A protein has these predicted regions:
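Bacterial N-terminal signal peptides that target proteins for export
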Residues: 1-9
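Hydrophobic alpha-helical targeting segments used for export or membrane insertion
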Residues: 9, 13-17
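Catalytic centers of hydrolytic enzymes
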Residues: 23-279
């Protein structure tokens, strides 16, 4: 399981039932931050929170988190080239509130911490080119083929940081679905080169790096290998929610600079969730 605030907080995850609106409040809960109503930034459109959206499509919140990871160690001598976050770490059911969507407009610190609930640590580590491509294959391996119903989307699906992109063909077999990959605007050769001296510095949460969502078979002990230079984020306790909130404040502080979803993953022959008219 991902790292959480405490055992008691995890056991307290008694989620309220939806009642035809966007949110339903639990009977009792405690705010996760000192000022839950403080606005940390603005959303440029409605953001849907069902698993079909967070785990099977591009997603504004997932892209925000990946961007925050990318820039978490900008002041280090070896900053990240790519930030990734698994869709399974984005939660619609929080300790206090269950949501189906976030409306366009202001996003509060309390909302953001409910959505990024587990307080995973952010770690930057060197991956070989093969590990990077295999990581992307793990990300898209469980995507449903076009025409299929998305019934149990995998939390392993990765959202990518700005400047990087992925093209995936779901008609191809698992392990051979990645058709194109760029990191920081530079194309990654496919198939990947076997030269282990070629490294990509990637920021991710410790849950993935420790093998969660099936990534152990890809990453092995990379997070514990000094030769991979693993570095935990130093600011704001090093946790994903705090780092993302600070990044949101700096990059999307006004409606004019509102967060917008981008097409960073291009899907070919893949099932996609149906979006309401106008989105």
């Amino acid at each position: 399981m991902p790292r959480s605030r405490s055992l008691l907080a995890t056991l307290a995850l008694a989620v309220g039932t939806l009642h035809g609106g966007c949110i339903a409040y639990n009977d009792s809960c405690q705010p996760l931050v000192e000022d839950p109503d403080a606005v940390v930034g603005y959303l440029g459109h409605e953001v849907f929170l069902d698993k079909n959206f967070t785990r099977h499509d591009n997603h504004a919140l997932g892209q925000l988190v990946a961007d925050a990871f990318l820039h978490a160690e900008d002041d280090s001598t070896r900053p990240a080239m790519l930030g990734v976050v698994n869709g399974g770490s984005l939660r619609q059911e929080g300790l206090c509130v269950t949501r189906t969507s976030l409306r366009k407009g202001p996003l509060t610190d309390g909302e953001l911490h409910e959505l990024i609930l587990f307080e995973n640590l952010v770690v930057t580590v060197d991956l070989t080119e093969k590990e990077l491509v295999d990581m992307m294959e793990q990300s898209v391996g469980a995507l449903y083929v076009e025409g299929q119903s998305i019934t149990f989307p995998s939390g392993a699906f990765l959202h990518l940081s700005s400047g990087s992109s992925l093209r995936v063909d779901c008609s191809r077999p698992r392990g051979a679905r990645v058709r194109a990959l760029t990191v920081g605007g530079t194309s990654v050769p496919l198939p990947p080169r076997e030269d282990v001296s070629i490294r990509y510095r990637v920021a991710m949460n410790a849950y993935i790096l420790d093998g969660g969502d099936g990534y152990g078979a890809v990453l092995g002990n990379a997070g514990k290998d000094p030769g991979r230079n693993p570095v935990q984020a130093r600011k704001l306790g090093g946790t994903d929610a705090n780092i993302t909130a600070a990044y949101m404040k700096s990059k999307h502080p006004t409606p004019v600079q509102a967060l917008m979803e981008e097409q960073r993953v291009v899907f070919e022959n893949c099932a996609l969730p149906a979006r309401p008219a106008g989105r």
